[in-house]
A protein has these predicted regions:
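Core alpha/beta nucleotide-donor-binding catalytic domains of modification enzymes
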Residues: 1-195
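ATP/NTP-dependent adenylation/nucleotidyl-transfer catalytic domains that generate, transfer
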Residues: 185-250
């Protein structure tokens, strides 16, 4: 996987080379593997860890684990405890906003160039079904974006099995999040119930779905380019007004 990861960076994310990177590490397998891969490539990195106290001692143990990982590797470690008191159905969305707001604060304060998160192919599949269930357009069916402003997701082409295999093959330890086994959230229900059924139907479901998301992204780009070309030819801006040429309405 290390060779594939290096090639992916060289071919698709070459702008990361020589940059200062803030790696977001929860302590789970995905983020610890991302940390390991990036650290082996000799980037200048720091690690950011959020503790939302949602699992009490387990959450504190995660923080200690990540802090110790950074000490062993002599990597700068940034940690923040969040005390959120919000309705259960809003926890994930609120936590996400708090998390990314803080990551961007660290980016500015410590002069990092990019924020790296450990989202992978399985996460993108789950996001597809979440958006599909809530009604969406083509944008919502393209999965998780590999690049979003300063946030980069280098593991997106890799599936969960590849990540776990790499961790086991390299004796990498990680923390298990017990909440992932519960079906309290829609994402967990999709991960634990829907996706296994789809894999039973087609053992190569994950790889096939990856191709589908790729094609949807390509189609979305073509559509956006067509719309932009149409606007550039038929729309005009004048005195804070947008004018549409009559020929465009025929």
């Amino acid at each position: 996987m290390l060779d594939l990861f290096n090639k992916h960076i060289d071919n698709n994310l070459p702008f990361l080379h020589g940059k200062k990177l803030l790696v977001c590490v929860s302590g789970g397998a995905d983020s610890v593997v991302l940390f390991s891969l990036i650290n082996k490539m000799n980037y200048t990195i720091g690690v950011a860890h959020c503790n939302f106290k949602l699992r009490h001692k387990e959450s504190d143990d995660d923080s200690f684990f990540v802090e110790n990982l950074c000490k062993i590797n002599s990597i700068p470690f940034y940690s923040k405890d969040f005390d959120i008191n919000i309705p259960k159905h809003s926890v994930q969305m609120a936590a996400r906003k708090l998390r990314y707001d803080w990551f961007y604060e660290l980016l500015e304060l410590h002069k990092y160039d990019f924020i790296l998160t450990a989202h992978h192919l399985n996460d993108s599949i789950e996001t597809f079904f979440i958006n599909l269930s809530r009604s969406t357009g083509i944008d919502g069916l393209t999965g998780i974006k590999s690049i979003n402003n300063k946030v980069v997701r280098p593991l997106l082409p890799f599936n969960k099995s590849q990540i776990i295999d790499y961790a086991n093959d390299n004796n990498i330890k990680w923390r298990e999040d017990s909440s992932n086994l519960k079906d309290n959230y829609l994402r967990n229900k999709i991960r634990n119930k829907l996706v296994p059924i789809l894999r039973d139907i087609d053992s190569d479901f994950t790889n096939n779905f990856s191709k589908t998301i790729y094609r949807l992204n390509e189609s979305n780009l073509i559509l956006k380019e067509h719309i932009q070309n149409f606007k550039s030819v038929n729309f005009q801006t004048k005195n804070d007004e947008i004018l549409i040429l009559k020929t465009a309405l025929k």
